[in-house]
């Protein structure tokens, strides 16, 4: 998929997620790896209303170090750009990352401490996890949950440490407590599928609390 088409697809998802109440106002951020240059990615610019996003409301960032490479006048990278940069750098095969602020993901409380940084939380072995390509019967799965530091690069650093020390999660997402999930996939379509499954999973978990 060429870059223009990719940005158009991400823009459509932004409008859809706004309608689903997954990204109110300027909350959330979506990105796609540049298919013609996989060492860079395009992410929604900071301060853009997700229900009114245009396919020109993106900036280009380096996968290697998060350096801003291209941006139209006045556009700045999303606040969570450092998290996307870590995900693309740690997983060279992924092509899309989606971060939203759903109600259920904010209702879930695990009490991850600031000094603790992160914790693996068990997830129920329900049918929807097949959307992640996991077909084992009643698998014993966990999801990484991270403390919601005000300084977002600190969250990104803890995610990187987790990936290096623990490994890539078996499930294609992570959760920032009191904030929202971030999912990834090899393509925009796969990442969207994963996000829909994660939304359902977190709904179930929120109702069990």
From Swiss-Prot:
Record Gene3D superfamilies: Class II aldolase/adducin N-terminal domain (3.40.225.10)
Record text on cofactor binding: Binds 1 zinc ion per subunit.
Cofactor(s) in the UniProt record: Zn(2+)
One GO molecular-function entry: zinc ion binding
EC number assigned by the record: 4.2.1.109
Record keywords: Amino-acid biosynthesis, Lyase, Metal-binding, Methionine biosynthesis, Zinc
Residues at which Zn(2+) binds: 99, 101
Pfam families hit by this protein: Aldolase_II
GO aspect biological process, one term: L-methionine salvage from methylthioadenosine
Superkingdom: Bacteria
NCBIfam families listed in its UniProt record: salvage_mtnB
Role played: Catalyzes the dehydration of methylthioribulose-1-phosphate (MTRu-1-P) into 2,3-diketo-5-methylthiopentyl-1-phosphate (DK-MTP-1-P).
Protein name: Methylthioribulose-1-phosphate dehydratase
Species the sequence originates in: Leptospira biflexa serovar Patoc (strain Patoc 1 / ATCC 23582 / Paris)
Record lineage: Bacteria, Pseudomonadati, Spirochaetota, Spirochaetia, Leptospirales
Name of the coding gene: mtnB
